[in-house]
Amino acid sequence: MAVQQNRKSPSKRDMRRSHDALGFSTLSTDSKSGERHRRHHVTKDGFYRGKQVIVHPVESVEVDDEV
């Protein structure tokens, strides 16, 4: 098991943790739909880099003719 040789000061601990903060994700605008999305991710409409890569199925409406 690893055991530290000397105790680290709070300053050294905080300097090590200085890079742990979460940053904001970079957003891009789709050229086709104009929708904002995370970079390198598909938009909610299914577009990626101006091309439709996912086609959402159309919900069919059932009609009852038994009236």
From Swiss-Prot:
Source organism, top-level taxon: Bacteria
Matching InterPro entries: Ribosomal_bL32, Ribosomal_bL32_bact, Ribosomal_zn-bd
Gene Ontology annotations for the cellular component aspect, listed alphabetically: large ribosomal subunit
Comp. bias intervals (Basic and acidic residues): 11-20
Annotated signal sequence range: none
Annotated Pfam families: Ribosomal_L32p
Single GO biological process annotation from the record: translation
Similarity remark: Belongs to the bacterial ribosomal protein bL32 family.
PANTHER family: 50S RIBOSOMAL PROTEIN L32, LARGE RIBOSOMAL SUBUNIT PROTEIN BL32
Name used for this protein in its record: Large ribosomal subunit protein bL32
Organism encoding this protein: Dichelobacter nodosus (strain VCS1703A)
The organism's taxonomic lineage, starting at the top: Bacteria, Pseudomonadati, Pseudomonadota, Gammaproteobacteria, Cardiobacteriales
Gene name of this polypeptide: rpmF
